Amino acid sequence: MNHAITMGIFWHLIGAASAACFYAPFKKVKHWSWETMWSVGGTVSWLILPWTISAILLPDFWAYFTSFNASTLLPVFLFGAMWGIGNINYGLTMRYLGMSMGIGIAIGITLIVGTLMTPILNGNFDVLINTHGGRMTLLGVLVAVIGVGIVTRAGQLKERKMGITAEDFNLRKGLVLAVMCGIFSAGMSFAMNAAKPMHEAAAALGVDPLYVALPSYVVIMGGGALVNLGFCFIRLAKVKNLSVKADFSLAKPLIVTNVLLSALGGLMWYLQFFFYAWGHASIPSQYDYMSWMLHMSFYVLCGGMVGLVLKEWNNAGRRPVGVLSLGCVVIIIAANIVGLGMAS
């Protein structure tokens, strides 16, 4: 496995670790509605950071974006909006299925759809079947899905042991939402594929290869922001017990603390895709669709490890922790199989 591929896998791991931790600051926000908190954090992660970093990287911000026609920008934006719909469905999936089953089904589906649909859409799926490297990466995807399934099982054992149940368990509704979440969340993978002309244009302007994907986030995350912020604003306007005015009528020190914590959560959320861009740039172009598989499987891996560090599994017993550890090992093996496939 060459150095570039190793570093690509490493950067995806760092990005996934940030994704697994990003909600920790949000949990410390007090006396705010989820909608206000999510809007503040989202404004930082989907609007302020992508625009600011792009303005720093590009020699002429407006000239860069106006150089593309609608046929280039619209698919990127719409796939970003598609991914934003997946974000909203993610929370509803957890509500109706519980954390473990919801994450397992949603992540498993988005891992498969986001990874394999890209080469199919590009007309390159035969490369996966007819080459040794392609077959190795397919095997890696299969092993990763198995690893996600094992971690999901560990979570179910933990929830059963600790008496944790879904907020409003509904198997049929939860499964429909989980499938929708998995499919729509793959929009980020499709958006990155559609944004290749933007990456190439950034490279032509002298942007470092590690950073060429970052300007496209202005459009991708703009689509996600439209859906997420629109959802939050509609709820804040229509739901009687939600009020932005009430949220910002608290004591000033608490408001400042809540804003800073939400902004920190937004920063950590953005960093997952900052390092995703680094990992994506380090992987051979013919296998760039594997970025999504690495990101999502590492997200599950890091989520389990963060849970252990935060002692969320202390009262779960030895068996769930053992199953979790096995699942993490399987995901690590999957990443190595994919790495070897890309290097062959």
Swiss-Prot record:
Coiled coil: none annotated. It comes from the Bacteria. It catalyses: L-rhamnopyranose(in) + H(+)(in) = L-rhamnopyranose(out) + H(+)(out). Uptake of L-rhamnose across the cytoplasmic membrane with the concomitant transport of protons into the cell (symport system). Belongs to the L-rhamnose transporter (TC 2.A.7.6) family. It comes from Enterobacter sp. (strain 638). One of its GO terms (molecular function) is symporter activity. Keywords: Cell inner membrane, Cell membrane, Membrane, Sugar transport, Symport, Transmembrane, Transmembrane helix, Transport. This is L-rhamnose-proton symporter. The chain crosses the membrane at residues 4-24, 38-58, 72-92, 101-121, 137-157, 175-195, 214-234, 259-279, 290-310, 321-341. Its main location: membrane. One of its GO terms (cellular component) is plasma membrane. It is a multi-pass membrane protein. It is found in: Cell inner membrane. HAMAP family: RhaT.
